[in-house]
């Protein structure tokens, strides 16, 4: 898939060449995520069982509480990245549409490539900010306020895009 999207080139006997991603690719990937995730979080805000939302909130709060003074090792970074990805993937999965899920995974792949290229460094403060942003989305869903959930999600995307660029 990455090769068909022009993100990598496989060179015989030389290996894989990662094509340098640019700002346009990042913007396009986040725009695709927004198109897919906005209806997902709207749907969650209206229909996800309260206990499921409370469990999501509790997991985020636990990670936020642990992030203070956390030494971010490669293992911690992988765990947090997987946690972040699961939050977004689970929202899209809640729509029960495999086509949307595949498109969403592809957008995430683009963002991961850009983070690699930008030498994206995950810090304890970045983890805390991300968890706070996620909590704002989850709490809006708990309040059954889809507009607030979308507003919090859009703010999260704007900040996540800045973090991916190292700004």
Show which residues each predicted segment covers.
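Short linear motifs at protein or domain termini
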Residues: 1-46, 99, 161, 165-166
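Residue-level marker of regulatory loop/turn positions in helix-turn-helix DNA-binding domains and
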Residues: 18, 29, 33, 80, ...
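A ubiquitous short alpha-helical element
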Residues: 22-26, 45-49, 71-75, 117-124
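Conserved amphipathic alpha-helical segments that form helical-bundle/coiled-coil interaction surfaces
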Residues: 41, 50-117, 131-140, 148-160
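General secondary-structure edge motif
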Residues: 6-9, 20, 36, 71, ...
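Short, flexible segments with low predicted structural confidence
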Residues: 1-2, 11-12, 27, 75-76, ...
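Short alpha-helix boundary/capping motifs
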Residues: 30-31, 46, 68-69, 119-121, ...
């Amino acid at each position: 898939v990455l090769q068909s999207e022009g993100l990598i080139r496989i060179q015989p006997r030389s290996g894989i060449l990662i094509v340098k991603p640019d700002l346009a690719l990042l913007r396009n990937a986040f725009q695709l995520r927004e198109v897919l995730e906005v209806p997902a979080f709207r749907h969650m805000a209206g229909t996800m069982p309260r206990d499921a939302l409370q469990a999501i909130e509790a997991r985020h709060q636990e990670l936020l509480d642990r992030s203070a003074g956390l030494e971010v090792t490669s293992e911690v970074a992988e765990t947090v990245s997987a946690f972040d990805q699961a939050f977004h993937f689970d929202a899209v999965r809640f729509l029960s549409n495999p086509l949307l899920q595949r498109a969403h995974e592809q957008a995430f792949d683009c963002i991961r490539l850009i983070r690699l290229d930008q030498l994206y460094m995950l810090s304890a403060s970045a983890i805390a900010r991300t968890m706070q942003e996620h909590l704002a989305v989850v709490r809006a869903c708990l309040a059954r306020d889809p507009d607030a959930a979308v507003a919090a999600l859009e703010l999260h995307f704007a900040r996540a895009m800045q973090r991916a660029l190292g700004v």
